[in-house]
UniProtKB/Swiss-Prot annotation:
The UniProt record lists the keyword Cytoplasm: yes
Localisation: Cytoplasm
Residue stretches in coiled coil: none
Organism listed in the record: Dinoroseobacter shibae (strain DSM 16493 / NCIMB 14021 / DFL 12)
InterPro entries: Cytidylate_kin, Cytidylate_kinase_dom, P-loop_NTPase
Superkingdom classification of source: Bacteria
Family per similarity comment: Belongs to the cytidylate kinase family. Type 1 subfamily.
Descriptive protein name: Cytidylate kinase
GO molecular function: ATP binding; CMP kinase activity; dCMP kinase activity
Amino acid sequence: MNFAIAIDGPAAAGKGTIGRAMAAHFGFPHMDTGLLYRAVGRRVLSGMPALEAARALTPEDLQADGLRTAEVGQAASQVAALPQVRAALLDFQRAFAQRAGGAILDGRDIGTVICPDAAVKLFVTASDDVRAQRRHAELISKGADLTLEAVLADLQARDARDMQRADAPLKPAEDAMVLDTSRLSIDEAVEKAIALATARMAAREFSPIRPN
């Protein structure tokens, strides 16, 4: 039986951290779909046309260095606004979501476009200031020289682009459960997400095979 968990939300809200923790808890494979667009964006920055980059994407591209830089993040947001790029990556994501036993995907349009029939849909969010502080700390720890104000402006510009694009805009699915992590620790956010998913599993009489 397939059991897909869709996690959506803006940058630095915690969806990736929650997705990885839930994957470890339930023994599900996990895909950070944002890495697909970052990998495409990275190729575009090197001079490759966006659609060609999307079609040429390989699993190895998702392991490339430099995918988490602010420059690549902005490029990812820009290529993600292109309908032809999103279409080129659609089957790749849906095939992952259909894995036997279960799968967890996090991104910006998982519950609305990629997996509209997902058994669990979470929309993870947090205030702009909290998200900027998290991303700033992450980037500084990696040696970046950016001000908090610059990071906040970057996040807000990306939010606007993601929410206003005509194709698959960032928004909660109508049946998504919203999880605001602004005042939660990582452990608290993960605990709440797991509890929500566990309750939905019980309602569907689904029992995951957890790792030893």
